[in-house]
């Protein structure tokens, strides 16, 4: 089986990707995980909720997830989920809208402490509602697979603190793929991996380290996860962009 991660930046482009990139077979025979960055930004503006963007000591940019922001995040992700499910159903796919909260599908743990660089100083933040993934309930997910195509919004549930969590969509897809023994992990993004201004169409996992100098932010994270995925038994990792496709093996 295959796990597909739909990036938040391409949700609005699904119709074009369906028509021009031939993703119908990919989306119809998979477990789908999605992000929703655009929806979060739009809803926060409408609700007048300011989202603070911080940078970790390693240079990664992230949203600070306060309790107020968490409410926006959950609502926005559910909106994104409905948009994807509606699109897929219009294409004849029996899509099933889910979040990690449903039947405790994705179990997470709130990060008790995160670090950010603010005004040149490393600051500890203890009231954030982002989390790490601890478990994927594969039994429940297999039940949904018997009747349709699961579409999972990237929200996890922390049973100890009884709270939803903001979790990284790429990491949700990665953990679902490992837990379900998927053969392929497929990232549907706005761009394939590029080096020297050109799309890298094929990339052996054992050469990824040499290419990291060309990757930043989310792409660097995808490449490192791809290497871990291949080493864990996943056959292929694909990064499908509007400009081409990178296959990592």
UniProtKB/Swiss-Prot annotation:
Domain of life: Archaea
Site for Transition state stabilizer, residues: 5, 222
One cellular-component annotation, GO: cytoplasm
Role summary: Involved in both the arginine and lysine biosynthetic pathways. Phosphorylates the LysW-bound precursors glutamate (for arginine biosynthesis), respectively alpha-aminoadipate (for lysine biosynthesis).
Molecular functions per Gene Ontology: acetylglutamate kinase activity; ATP binding; N2-acetyl-L-aminoadipate kinase activity
Cysteine pairings via disulfide bonds: none
A Gene Ontology biological process term: arginine biosynthetic process via ornithine
This enzyme's EC code(s): 2.7.2.17, 2.7.2.19
Native source organism of the sequence: Pyrococcus furiosus (strain ATCC 43587 / DSM 3638 / JCM 8422 / Vc1)
Reaction(s) catalysed (UniProt annotation): [amino-group carrier protein]-C-terminal-N-(1,4-dicarboxybutan-1-yl)-L-glutamine + ATP = [amino-group carrier protein]-C-terminal-N-(1-carboxy-5-phosphooxy-5-oxopentan-1-yl)-L-glutamine + ADP; [amino-group carrier protein]-C-terminal-gamma-(L-glutamyl)-L-glutamate + ATP = [amino-group carrier protein]-C-terminal-gamma-(5-phospho-L-glutamyl)-L-glutamate + ADP
Name this polypeptide is given: Putative [LysW]-aminoadipate/[LysW]-glutamate kinase
Top-rank EC class of the record's enzyme: transferase
Pathway the protein contributes to: Amino-acid biosynthesis; L-lysine biosynthesis via AAA pathway; L-lysine from L-alpha-aminoadipate (Thermus route): step 2/5; Amino-acid biosynthesis; L-arginine biosynthesis
Coiled coil: none
Family to which this protein belongs: Belongs to the acetylglutamate kinase family. LysZ subfamily.
Biological classification of the source: Archaea, Methanobacteriati, Methanobacteriota, Thermococci, Thermococcales
Location (main, coarse): cytoplasm
Gene3D superfamilies listed in its UniProt record: Acetylglutamate kinase-like
PANTHER family the record matches: N-ACETYLGLUTAMATE SYNTHASE, N-ACETYLGLUTAMATE SYNTHASE, MITOCHONDRIAL
Subcellular localization(s) per the UniProt record: Cytoplasm
Residues reported to bind substrate: 63, 166
Pfam families for the chain: AA_kinase (PF00696)
Keywords, sorted A to Z: Amino-acid biosynthesis, Arginine biosynthesis, ATP-binding, Cytoplasm, Kinase, Lysine biosynthesis, Nucleotide-binding, Transferase
